Amino acid sequence: MASTTVCSAARIRVASSQVLRSIANTRTYATTSPESSIPETKPTAKRTPTTFKDKLNKGPSFSDFIGGATEPPLSPDEAYALKTALVGPAGKKKEITRLPSWLKTPIPDSSSYKKIKNDLRGLNLHTVCEEARCPNISECWGGGSKAAATATIMLMGDTCTRGCRFCSVKTSRTPPPLDPHEPENTAEALSRWGLGYVVLTAVDRDDLVDGGARHFAETVRRIKGKAPNILVECLTGDFSGDMEMVSLMAESGMDVFAHNVETVEALTPFVRDRRASFQQSLSVLRGAKAANPELITKTSLMLGLGETKEQVLDALKQLRASQVDVVTFGQYMRPTKRHMAVHEYVRPDVFDMWKEKAMEMGFLYCASGPLVRSSYKAGEAFIENVLKKRAKERIGGAVEDSVKGKDVLL
C-alpha cells in the first residue's frame, strides 16, 4: 500500500513539472514581442541633410573668406531688422523675437557687485536696479578703473501704490509701513561702499499724506552728513502735484532733482498710471527749479513704445521750456508678458540723432542709447559733463571776484 502511494506521488510530480515547462514555454513577457511583430532588418538609409548642413552648403566657402566679400553690405534697415526664432518642443514651437546684439549685457560678477548686494540684504535695503530688472546692473555696480561704481537705492519699500504698464515693481493699495531706520541704514551703507555718485529713488506712496517726501528728504540729509563728497541724485515721484513737498525735496541738499516724464504726452495715458500726467510732471520739474534755482533738473524718456518723431520733438520743446537741464533716452524693454509689448527696437543711430537734437535745443547734457536708463552710469556721464563743468565755472567766478577784492565763500 505504501509503495503504491509513493508511485502515485512520483507520477504527480512528473506531470506537474511537465505542465510547468509547458506554461513557461508559452508565457510572454513585457520585454519580448511576438515573432510576427518583430520588424525585418533593413539596410540603413542614407541620412538626410539637416537644416544646419544645408545652410553650410549654401553659405560662403573658405575661398570666399580669403578673397573677401563680393556682395554689398546690408542696408541699415536690414541690419537692424528684428530677429526671430522658433523655440519649444515639436508641435508647440513659438516664434520669439531675439534681442539685437546692442541690447545684450554681461552677467554680473565682480567683487564690488557682490559687496553691494550683500550689504543690501544685511540692511534690508532695496534697489531699483534689481526691482526693475535693469540690464546695466553689472556695469553700474561693478564700476571700474576709470569710473566709480554707482547704485540706485529704492526707498520706502519695494511695493508701489501705482501700476504703470511698463514697470515691474510690485503694486498694492496698502503697502507695508515705512521703515524708520531706513534713512540711517542707507547713509551707513553708502558711506562704506566708496561710491562716487548715488541715485535715490522711491516707490510712489499715495497712501501717505506727504507721499513720503519727509522720509526721502531725511535720507538725503543723513547721507550728506556721513559722506559729504558723494553726489546725490534723487529720482522722485510727482507727490500728486503737491508743490510744498516738491520744494521740501528740492531743498534737502541733493545735487540733482530728477523726475521722469517716461514717454511723450500722447502716449502717457496708455503707459503710465492714470494718476500721473505729462503736464503734472512738467509742473513738478518747474517747481523744483523754482525752489532751488541752482539745482540741476533731469528727466527721462523711453523710446520704442510707438511714439512719432513729432511727438518726441514736442516733448523736448516742453521740457526745455520748463528749464529742464538734462534729458536721457533709452530703449523700452518689456519686463514680463503682462506688461506692454515693445513696439519697436530703436536703432542706435536714431538714439544718436536725438542726442544731437537735445544738445542743439540747449540741454546741458543728454545721454541717449538703447541701454541708457535714467540713472545709467550717472557717476561717469553726469559728473564729467555737468557737475564738474559747473564747479569749474563757480571756482572761476570766485577767483575773479577775489582778484577784484570781493569777499568770496566757496
Curated annotation (Swiss-Prot):
Region Disordered: start-end pairs: 29-49
Matching Gene3D superfamilies: Aldolase class I
Compartment(s) where it occurs, according to its Swiss-Prot or TrEMBL record: Mitochondrion
Pathway(s) per entry: Protein modification; protein lipoylation via endogenous pathway; protein N(6)-(lipoyl)lysine from octanoyl-[acyl-carrier-protein]: step 2/2
Positions of [4Fe-4S] cluster 1 binding: C129, C134, C140, S375
Reactions performed catalytically: [[Fe-S] cluster scaffold protein carrying a second [4Fe-4S](2+) cluster] + N(6)-octanoyl-L-lysyl-[protein] + 2 oxidized [2Fe-2S]-[ferredoxin] + 2 S-adenosyl-L-methionine + 4 H(+) = [[Fe-S] cluster scaffold protein] + N(6)-[(R)-dihydrolipoyl]-L-lysyl-[protein] + 4 Fe(3+) + 2 hydrogen sulfide + 2 5'-deoxyadenosine + 2 L-methionine + 2 reduced [2Fe-2S]-[ferredoxin]
One cellular-component annotation, GO: mitochondrion
Pfam (any one): LIAS_N
Keywords: 4Fe-4S, Iron, Iron-sulfur, Metal-binding, Mitochondrion, S-adenosyl-L-methionine, Transferase, Transit peptide
Feature: compositional bias, Polar residues: 29-39
Organelle targeting peptide span: 1-29
Cofactor annotation comment: Binds 2 [4Fe-4S] clusters per subunit. One cluster is coordinated with 3 cysteines and an exchangeable S-adenosyl-L-methionine.
Cofactor entry: [4Fe-4S] cluster
Principal location class: mitochondrion
Residues binding [4Fe-4S] cluster 2: C160, C164, C167
Listed InterPro entries: Aldolase_TIM, Elp3/MiaA/NifB-like_rSAM, LIAS_N, Lipoyl_synth, rSAM
GO molecular function: 4 iron, 4 sulfur cluster binding; lipoate synthase activity; metal ion binding
Span of domain Radical SAM core: 143-364
NCBIfam families from the UniProt entry: lipA (TIGR00510), PRK05481.1 (NF004019), PRK12928.1 (NF009544)
Family named by the database record: Belongs to the radical SAM superfamily. Lipoyl synthase family.
Protein name per its UniProtKB record: Lipoyl synthase, mitochondrial
